[in-house]
Regions:
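Active-site neighborhoods of enzymes that stabilize oxyanions during catalysis
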Residues: 27-30, 145-216, 297-308
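Phosphate-coordinating loops and pocket residues in cytosolic domains that bind phosphorylated ligands
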Residues: 60, 150, 294
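C-terminal soluble interaction/assembly domains
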Residues: 233, 243, 248-305
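Bacterial N-terminal signal peptides
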Residues: 9-19
Length: 308
């Protein structure tokens, strides 16, 4: 009886341990992220990635053990189009150099503040790239550095470099699509094309883009509607925005393709729908509007579309 009880307790202990460190993609509270960082168990210590573009921001202070991975190092000009995702071999080399590891949890963050601050998009873009290359244990720190500091958690100016990483053998490139697949899929009645940019860009009232408007058939859903007004790095609970999302026509039964200007805003909308709302089929058109505007054989429109 005692032996059987000991076996049961041991099994429960193992189950709890596995549950605490199980692989998943989603968000994590600052307190829980700090608990992982401070863990004495090397097997659960996370890879922490500070994705801010400004290196001086990293110098001013960052999460303990954070390795600075400027999000824009993962993009460059290709065929004359700026900020395209880099080729596979270069991207993989950069991720390995940053310590990305198939066997570890990855904590990703930027700063966070009111709009126009949009540094959460740096974090969601890096999370997208990691997921694309097969990493399945990724958490964005909810609220970013702003909330971390509000909760009086430790910040340091010490530098940290991760040891060489190791990527999974199999990638998940199906989470993104290229222009050819977009053109094939976008007119399917079960497909919903969603533009994650601000509404003024969607209807062409901006001074940014070579051509004005959006991809024909796309609806508008600005990514910031899913985030807290006083901190764009803080995710609103899905229950709080469920009706807003549904009323816009975004439902889990649809195949959803998101895009934006350069893919950062789209990466956030995809992350929320896929990993917070748990929609099963959400993909990102990686080229986004910056690529589409160069393809002048394909039309653009400025009239607003609604889901019927």
């Amino acid at each position: 009886m005692v032996v059987e009880m000991n076996r049961l307790l041991f099994a429960i202990f193992i189950w709890i341990g596995c549950t605490l460190v199980r692989a998943e993609i989603g968000i994590i509270s600052p307190a829980e992220a700090n608990r992982l960082i401070e863990s004495s168990d090397a097997s659960v210590k996370p890879i922490v990635l500070d994705t801010r573009g400004g290196y001086k921001d990293y110098f001013r202070g960052h999460l303990p053990t954070a390795h600075h991975l400027n999000f824009d190092t993962l993009r460059g000009t290709q065929n004359g189009i700026p900020v395209e995702y880099l080729p596979d071999d270069i991207t993989k080399a950069l991720l390995i150099r940053a310590g990305v590891n198939r066997d570890r949890t990855h904590l990703i963050y930027a700063t966070g503040d009111k709009l126009p601050n949009d540094e959460i998009l740096s974090a969601s873009m890096v999370a997208y790239v990691l997921e694309k290359y097969g990493v399945n244990d990724i958490r964005i720190v909810d609220g970013g550095l702003m909330k971390w500091q509000q909760e009086k958690l430790p910040v340091t100016q010490e530098y940290f470099g991760n040891p060489k990483g190791a990527l999974p053998k199999f990638d998940s490139k199906q989470i993104g699509i290229d222009i050819d697949e977009l053109l094939k899929r976008k007119n399917d009645p079960n497909v919903l094309l969603v533009d994650a940019r601000p509404y003024n860009e969607y209807i062409g009232q901006d001074d940014i883009w070579l051509r004005k408007g959006h991809i024909p058939g796309a609806i508008s859903f600005h990514w910031a509607r899913l985030m807290a007004k006083d901190n764009t790095h803080e995710f609103l609970p899905f229950e709080q925005v469920k009706m807003v999302v549904k009323d816009a026509g975004l439902t889990p039964e649809r195949e959803i393709i998101v895009y934006c200007g350069t893919s950062r805003e789209g990466s956030l909308l995809r992350f929320y729908l896929k990993h917070v709302a748990k929609f099963p089929n959400v993909r990102l058109y990686e080229g986004s509007w910056k690529e589409y505007v160069t393809l002048k054989q394909h039309p653009a429109e400025t009239l607003e579309n609604k889901v019927r």
